[in-house]
Regions:
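Terminal presequence/propeptide segments associated with secretion/organelle targeting
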Residues: 1-627
């Protein structure tokens, strides 16, 4: 759900996730007159629950190993490109057949960089309604300063309800609430969808991330953040509109900067170098394995060296505009949906197109002034790095002044109107060809260039890299079997650990924090900015039990995408909800260190306590506790 995880916590379709996972939907439900992000929200009755604009909840119901079917599509003598195409055609075929047969969203997912392929099938729900959200000041107490740090005091929790045929979904499988939560050294588990890790990548790939991809991403994020902050200063309403974007980019900047700094640490690179040396050493013990697999490490290294210049150019050839994103999405949706599955671009099967249409027709508000700020930041960076004479930007502007061109295509576009987008999609290619909207005309023009560029990328780099990675994965299986877990890929995973503190900054971090610490931190920062407590906290201060545990840390191995994962005990009862990792966890994209890598959770006791004593949401607390 919106890039995060969640769990059913009642028999009536109630889903628990993080506020920072749900805040995009909360913002879409907000207006200048009713800012739900700032004020919070609670629906005491079903009829008061607010339907989200474009939130999907996908529930995994089935998974099947289909490695033999996918690899069987590749025959002897195929080139790397032909092999990649053959596997993609087989994947498209299976996804279409399984979706048609079962009615479920069906995704073929690669594990071990192509070593295994599995079919994952999901029941998808799109009628999802907001039930409860605290005010941002409680959910994100401490702001970006405290993000990815510990100790923490955050009420980063939101509840939605899934509806089926207009009624709350009867969820027979759900987590029950623990009485008493967890204590230090208790065993805990987390089930969620970690987005992606790079632990099985070669040393060459990790060096490429350190030297090229991560610095470029950080630069883009910083440029965008600067533009958003400048825009937000123009008015209170501008600040409200920019807030969610700022939150997302600030979060990304801190996460990616943590990964980058981890890779600049010689100790991290020494660990990765030793892991690869040990692996290669195992291969070298067999002449047969050496002859068959060692060359692929060199192939990855050579491919990345050849790709450096191309990567740089591709990184600065994009238009970071929501309006243009709608336009290109509509052009691609219309073009690809007319083709047989086998002839479509990767990622445009029937199931994907259905989700794509759902997003393209979302009634969520689109703010053109925000879009201009974001778009100009990207354009200015792109032409600053490549110049307006670059072949991509030359096609975009066709001699026009870049800023005037941007203002014109955004101001004169109707794609901020959901009804207009829906009519365009329903009108098919004829509607597109007759459309005078400048964003659509730009998308039709650039689509041809982008398809050619993407094809060159797939044929000359992606297919060859995929071939090498799959061969390295074969060698890893022959030596280690399944003893090493696959990198994260946003499929459901289970991790376990202990509720446990750790040493940091010459002292110790406790296993859990309490409400006492929240007041101390607020007062220490003058009760201002991100450290100002919500009014309700002060109003009820004298009646609260400040010993109530609030947040805690565990040794569970998580990564981005795990946000919203339920934290459960050995009896599969809720003891918390994951909302973050500490600063030491950020290098966990590449290596996991149990001594200091920690997952942060909101304590289940505090969730119930806050609902009853701070938010007058006793009915919701009763539902969670089965009362």
């Amino acid at each position: 759900m919106d890039g995060g995880s969640g769990s059913f916590v009642s028999p009536d379709g109630l889903v628990m996730t993080n506020h920072h996972v749900g805040v995009g939907q909360i913002a879409k439900l907000s207006t200048a007159e009713r800012d739900l992000v700032a004020e919070g929200f609670y629906a005491q009755e079903y009829k008061q629950e607010l339907k989200c604009a474009d939130l999907e909840v996908n529930i995994l119901v089935k998974m099947q190993n289909i490695t033999d079917q996918i690899k069987g599509a590749v025959t002897s003598g195929m080139s790397a490109k032909e092999a990649l195409d053959a596997k993609q055609h087989k994947i498209d075929q299976i996804e279409k057949e399984e979706t048609t047969k079962s009615g479920l969203r069906s995704d073929v997912v690669s594990f071990y960089t192509g070593g295994e392929y599995w079919l994952y099938q999901y029941k998808k729900y799109t009628d999802v309604r907001l039930v409860f959200a605290p005010e941002r000041q409680a959910a994100y107490f401490g702001g970006d300063n405290d993000n990815f740090t510990y100790p923490r005091w955050n009420f980063d929790v939101t509840f939605f309800r899934v509806y089926d045929n207009g009624k709350p979904l009867k969820s027979k499988d759900f987590f029950k609430w623990s009485e008493g939560g967890s204590k230090e050294n208790d065993l805990v588990f987390m089930s969620g969808n970690p987005g992606g890790t790079s632990r099985l990548k070669t040393l060459s790939q990790i060096k490429f991330a350190r030297d090229y991809s991560l610095p470029i991403r950080i630069e883009f994020i910083q440029t965008t953040l600067d533009a958003l902050r400048n825009y937000a200063r123009t008015s209170e309403e501008a600040a409200r509109r920019a807030l969610i974007y700022q939150f997302g980019y600030e979060n990304s900047k801190k996460a990616i900067s943590g990964q980058y700094n981890g890779l600049k640490n010689p100790e991290t690179m020494e660990i990765k170098a030793k892991q690869e040396a040990d692996f290669i050493g195992q291969i070298k013990q067999s002449k047969e394995l050496s002859d068959k697999y060692l060359k692929y490490f060199d192939q990855v290294d050579q491919l990345l060296k050849e790709y450096e210049k191309n990567y740089y150019k591709r990184s600065y050839r994009s238009i970071s505009s929501k309006i243009f994103g709608f336009a290109l999405g509509i052009v691609r949706y219309t073009t690809e949906s007319q083709k047989p599955d086998m002839d479509r671009l990767p990622g445009y099967n029937d199931a994907a197109l259905h989700s794509m249409k759902f997003r393209l027709t979302s009634p969520a508000p689109v703010y053109k002034d925000v879009d201009k700020a974001l778009t100009w930041a990207g354009i200015k960076l792109g032409i600053g790095k490549l110049s307006v004479a670059d072949e991509f930007w030359r096609q975009v502007f066709e001699g026009s002044d870049p800023r005037e061109f941007m203002n014109s295509f955004i101001d004169n576009s109707q794609l901020d109107n959901a009804e207009f987008r829906t009519k365009l999609i329903e009108g098919g290619m004829k509607a597109l060809e007759n459309c005078k909207d400048p964003a659509i005309k730009l998308a039709l023009k650039l689509d041809k260039y982008m398809r050619t560029d993407d094809k060159n990328y797939r044929d000359n780099f992606e297919s060859k890299l995929a071939e090498a990675q799959e061969k390295i994965a074969e060698a890893r299986f022959l030596i280690y079997g399944n003893s090493k877990y696959p990198d994260a890929n946003f499929t459901l995973r289970l991790t376990y650990g202990q509720m446990k503190g750790y040493e940091m900054n010459g002292t110790k971090a406790p296993a859990f924090t309490t409400l006492y610490g929240m007041w101390d931190r607020s007062i220490s920062f003058g009760e201002t900015g991100d450290y100002a407590l919500p009014k309700r906290f002060w109003d009820k201060y004298t009646t609260l039990n400040l010993r109530t545990p609030m947040n805690f840390v565990s040794t569970c191995d998580i990564i981005g995408g795990n946000s919203g994962s339920p934290t459960i005990n050995k009896d599969a009862e809720i003891v918390g909800i994951v909302f973050d990792g500490n600063i030491e966890s950020l290098v966990g994209d590449y290596v996991y260190d149990i001594t200091s890598n920690r997952a942060l959770s909101v304590h289940s006791d505090f969730i119930i306590y806050a609902l009853r004593n701070l938010y007058d949401a006793g009915k919701l607390a009763d539902e969670l506790q089965g009362k």
